[in-house]
């Protein structure tokens, strides 16, 4: 009898791809990581298994067992403790995560446009984020990760 897997929507490989990216880009230079609006905490668990101290920040009550979980909405003021913030499809926390990049390194993989009230398409979303970073002198790099959705 095999153990029950957590059901996820979207490309199930995205968690592994992002975890590998974090290891490759940051390695041991980061110690404390926040998985912002990370749903059930699948990415949090993967990063913990790679010996990184990752904590889920998400107001939803359900999460995988054995992870640290702050059950509250993410606010940019929470960043002092963390070396790196990750938002894999952070939805409603997208804008707050973007603002947190003013003070901390952020890996942000947006999906839906929760940046502003107009909810425009993907190109407009990325342009709005880039403009915000440029206006605030935030260094950023746009990359494409190898997963769908």
Question: Residue locations for each model-derived region?
Answer:
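SAM cofactor-binding core of SAM-dependent methyltransferases
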Residues: 34-77
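Hydrophobic anchor at the start of a short beta-strand
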Residues: 53-57, 106, 138-140
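Conserved beta-strand signature within the Rossmann-like core of class I S-adenosyl-L-methionine
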Residues: 104-118
């Amino acid at each position: 009898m095999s153990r029950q897997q957590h059901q996820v929507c979207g490309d199930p490989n995205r968690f592994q791809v992002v975890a590998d990216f974090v290891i490759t880009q940051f390695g041991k230079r980061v110690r404390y990581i926040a998985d912002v609006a990370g749903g059930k905490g699948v990415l949090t668990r993967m990063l913990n298994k790679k010996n990184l101290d990752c904590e889920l920040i998400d107001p939803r009550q359900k999460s995988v067992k054995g992870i640290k979980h702050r059950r509250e909405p993410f606010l940019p003021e929470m960043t002092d403790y963390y070396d790196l913030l990750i938002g894999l499809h952070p939805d409603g926390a997208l804008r707050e995560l973007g603002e947190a990049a003013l003070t901390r390194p952020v890996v942000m993989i947006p999906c839906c446009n929760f940046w502003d009230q107009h909810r425009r398409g993907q190109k407009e979303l990325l342009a709005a984020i880039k403009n915000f970073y440029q206006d605030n002198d935030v260094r950023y790099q746009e990359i494409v990760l190898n997963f769908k959705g």
